């Protein structure tokens, strides 16, 4: 016949089964601690049982050491039969089981552990000290096969004094023993809406070695165990009546936090313990690095802060929202001891609290208990939960004082609040990011860098006195529909060849921006992407040079100190520093022998109209500079490029008879210039043109050529 002995020697009233060898062995599920409320009961897969009842079940495993050892002398306690069975034994039989001397107890200890050293007589050691040491060794042995996950949840209606760091609330002592997998300690006869005074959630499993440590005899003799620091779990399902909306504490032993440096590599394992009772020294912590609320140094700081107030029975640092969301900037700093966080990822804050219990307790548990965020089942996160990810905006700094008592973190306002609502305040990434131009700024300053009507020489003149990076974009004279980019660089490449009349030390480089259905693209640069507009092209190249020799500098004023598009012919000096250009229709070239002036232009136009077949016009770019006139065939049909030096020019003007050329059913003015023949030095050739676009009138180029010829005659 098996008997049950419950003794204070077993640290908190844990039950042990002593079975004779001639009878079938029976083991009992552990009874809850006497500190639990009377309405609590223990639920297993076999059904509900009263709190005080112990139901024997068959034990299939090998007998434990305590079952084979002699009985222990202790105070007799009451024995509770299971329902439907009679009381086991008589008082005389019970006395025979527990009536042992001190020598018998010492003999039993030596059989359990031959290395155990007995206390000498007369040192004041008591029988309780020896029994406590025996129990410590027993707990150490059982920790190899027992893994209990215990979550202690207390009500939000806790007594708070002097802010959130001094919150005391009733605690629940976890039962010790081998619980069945899936065992759940719930409260009955209490509505689910109000069931938040003191509740516990227990998960048991045999998945690895626990982190239990034997209790030293000195600590076991203390009349009252030390206060355990705690980390609060917010009661999301109920309204908090405390001033700061504190949740229930998640208790952890101080001795565990001292060992965090040694246990840090084990956080990634499946061993998961969550709480510790003041009665027993079973310390718990999270078993997955993805669910850690703090790093090791943060836990050490919280432990030191909690030990400063020993008057409270269960100190609470902050609520979960304050811990995970309102983290101080010091928590993001690297720990002083590198071994505390070695072998595990750093998790500055907890994962977000998702809606519909996506990353919290299962619905069956949540319906009967408060919402516990990020519950780990057997040390692993729930399916669907992802590790916390920090956005780049949150990596720089956090506003100090976000978790001050006067401004508590609003993490416990609603069940569906996530980290996106947390009061994170990000600092700008630096002056470099603030100075990066925006599309609006680029478009607003386009009047300074986009000059469609200027020529290549004008662009060079505008950028000659500017700093490296200055640029200007104009319409390309060689490729119709494309754009020319003039950019001032710091040094001229060795392969660059100087154009006629240009300085070899010129720092202005020219690039072609092609335009197509895909967008604008820098010609010859395959690594360059296509941009939807010139503004996008300029904005991107002002941030990153890409294929250009340097980044573009957005101008905020007129380049060259004046409006380079104005082509005034008031003085010869101003004409020498300017150039003009436009698109025109090239008609033909007619030899006028020795004629010059307006008569030569009149004769050439008359000869052209007298032909049976009129010439086919070609679009060319007419450019006038100090060096002369340069013609560029846009379509490359008649010629590629022709240059007429200023010394060969004789006259440039409109038709004296003001005749017009019919272009696409629209008349356009005809003009021409007279130059020496390149084959016959004694003859002159008149080159005829017609205006191509009303926006680009021929009067500008005609006036500039006339002014240049006048200056050449004076010289």
Curated annotation (Swiss-Prot):
PTM section of the record: Proteolytically cleaved by caspase-3 during apoptosis.
Localization annotation: Cell junction, Focal adhesion; Cytoplasm, Cytoskeleton
GO biological process terms on file: protein localization
Residue list for modification Phosphoserine: 82, 248
Alphabetized InterPro entries for the sequence: PH-like_dom_sf, PTB, PTB/PI_dom, SH2, SH2_dom_sf, Tensin_PTB, Tensin_PTEN_phosphatase
Keyword Zinc-finger included in the entry's annotation: no
GO cellular component, as recorded: cytoskeleton; cytosol; focal adhesion
SH2 domain segment(s): 449-556
Bias (Polar residues): 197-206
Keyword terms: Actin-binding, Cell junction, Cytoplasm, Cytoskeleton, Phosphoprotein, SH2 domain, Signal
PTB domain boundaries: 582-705
Taxonomy, superkingdom: Eukaryota
Residues under site feature: Cleavage: 570-571
Tissues expressing the protein: Expressed at low levels in colon (at protein level). Expressed in prostate and placenta.
CDD domains xrefs: PTB_tensin
Additional comment: Expression is up-regulated in tumors from a variety of tissues including lung, breast, colon, pancreas, stomach and ovary but is down-regulated in prostate cancer. In colorectal cancer cells, induces epithelial-mesenchymal transition (EMT) accompanied by down-regulation of CDH1/E-cadherin protein levels and increased cell migration. Contributes to cell motility in colorectal cancer cells by promoting EMT through its role in the post-transcriptional stabilization of SNAIL in an SH2-dependent manner which leads to increased cell migration.
Self-association and partners: Interacts (via SH2 domain) with Rho GTPase-activating protein DLC1 (via C-terminus); the interaction is independent of DLC1 tyrosine phosphorylation. Interacts with integrin ITGB1; the interaction displaces tensin TNS3 from the ITGB1 cytoplasmic tail and promotes ITGB1 stability. Interacts (via SH2 domain) with E3 ubiquitin-protein ligase CBL (phosphorylated on 'Tyr-774'); the interaction is enhanced in the presence of EGF and reduces interaction of CBL with EGFR.
Protein name: Tensin-4
Species per Swiss-Prot/TrEMBL record: Homo sapiens (Human)
Organism placement in taxonomy: Eukaryota, Metazoa, Chordata, Craniata, Vertebrata
Gene: TNS4
């Amino acid at each position: 016949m098996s008997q049950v002995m419950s003794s204070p020697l077993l640290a908190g009233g844990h039950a042990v089964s002593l079975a004779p060898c001639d009878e079938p062995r029976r083991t009992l599920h552990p009874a809850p601690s006497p500190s639990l409320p009377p309405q609590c009961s223990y639920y297993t897969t076999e059904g509900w049982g009263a709190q005080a009842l112990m139901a024997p079940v068959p034990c299939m495993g090998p007998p434990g050491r305590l079952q084979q050892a002699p009985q222990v002398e202790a105070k007799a306690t009451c024995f509770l039969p299971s329902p439907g069975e009679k009381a086991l034994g008589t008082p005389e039989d019970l006395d025979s089981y527990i009536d042992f001397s001190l020598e018998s107890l010492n003999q039993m200890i030596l059989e359990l552990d031959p290395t155990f050293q007995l206390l000498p007589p007369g040192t004041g050691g008591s029988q309780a000290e020896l029994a406590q040491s025996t129990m410590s060794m027993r707990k150490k042995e059982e920790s190899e096969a027992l893994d209990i996950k215990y979550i202690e949840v207390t009500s939000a209606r806790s007594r708070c004094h002097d802010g959130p760091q001094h919150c005391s609330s009733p605690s629940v002592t976890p039962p010790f023993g081998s619980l069945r997998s899936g065992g759940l300690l719930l409260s009955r006869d209490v509505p689910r809406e109000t069931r938040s005074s003191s509740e516990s959630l227990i998960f048991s499993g045999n998945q690895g070695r626990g982190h239990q440590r034997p209790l030293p005899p000195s600590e076991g003799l203390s009349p009252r165990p030390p206060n355990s620091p705690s980390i609060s779990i917010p009661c999301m399902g109920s309204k908090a009546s405390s001033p700061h909306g504190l949740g229930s504490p998640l208790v952890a032993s101080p001795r565990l936090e001292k060992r965090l440096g040694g246990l840090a590599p084990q956080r990634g394992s499946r061993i998961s313990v969550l709480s510790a009772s003041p009665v027993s020294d079973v310390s718990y912590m999270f078993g997955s690095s993805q669910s850690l609320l703090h790093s090791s140094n943060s836990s050490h700081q919280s432990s030191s802060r909690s030990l400063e107030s020993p008057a409270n029975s269960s100190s609470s640092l902050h609520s979960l929202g304050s811990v995970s969301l309102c983290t101080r900037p010091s928590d993001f700093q690297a720990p002083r001891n590198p071994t505390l966080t070695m072998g595990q990822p750093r998790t500055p804050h907890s994962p977000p609290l998702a809606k519909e219990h996506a990353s919290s307790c299962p619905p069956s548990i949540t319906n009967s208990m408060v919402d516990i965020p990020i519950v780990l089942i057997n040390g692993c996160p729930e399916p669907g939960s992802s590790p916390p990810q920090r956005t780049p905006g949150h990596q720089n700094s956090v506003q100090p004082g976000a978790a001050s008592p006067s401004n508590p973190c609003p993490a416990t306002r609603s069940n569906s609040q996530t980290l996106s609502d947390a009061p994170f305040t990000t600092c700008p990434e630096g002056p470099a990011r603030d100075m990066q131009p925006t599309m609006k700024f680029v478009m607003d300053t386009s009047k300074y860098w986009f000059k469609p009507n200027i020529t290549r020489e004008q662009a060079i003149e505008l950028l000659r006195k500017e700093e490296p990076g200055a640029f200007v974009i104009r319409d390309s004279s060689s490729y119709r529909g494309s754009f020319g980019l003039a950019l001032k660089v710091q040094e001229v490449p060795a392969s660059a060849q100087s154009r006629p009349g240009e300085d070899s030390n010129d720092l202005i480089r020219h690039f072609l921006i092609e335009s197509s259905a895909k967008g604008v693209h820098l010609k010859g640069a395959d690594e360059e992407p296509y941009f939807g507009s010139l503004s996008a092209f300029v904005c991107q190249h002002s941030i990153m040079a890409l294929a250009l020799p340097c980044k573009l500098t957005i101008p905020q004023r007129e380049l060259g100190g004046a409006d380079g598009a104005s082509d005034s012919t008031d003085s010869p000096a101003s004409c020498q520093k300017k150039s003009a250009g436009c698109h025109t229709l090239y008609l033909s070239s007619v030899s006028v022998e020795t004629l010059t002036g307006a008569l030569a232009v009149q004769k050439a136009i008359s000869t052209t109209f007298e032909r049976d077949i009129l010439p086919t016009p070609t679009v060319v770019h007419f450019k006038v500079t100090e060096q002369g006139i340069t013609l560029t065939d846009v379509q490359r049909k008649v010629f590629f490029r022709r240059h007429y030096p200023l010394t060969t020019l004789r006259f440039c003007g409109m038709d004296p008879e003001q005749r017009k050329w019919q272009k696409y059913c629209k008349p356009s003015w005809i003009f021409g210039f007279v130059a020496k023949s390149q084959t016959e030095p004694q003859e002159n050739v008149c080159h005829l043109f017609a205006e191509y676009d009303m926006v680009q009138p021929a009067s500008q180029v005609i006036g500039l050529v006339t002014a240049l010829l006048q200056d050449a005659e004076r010289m």
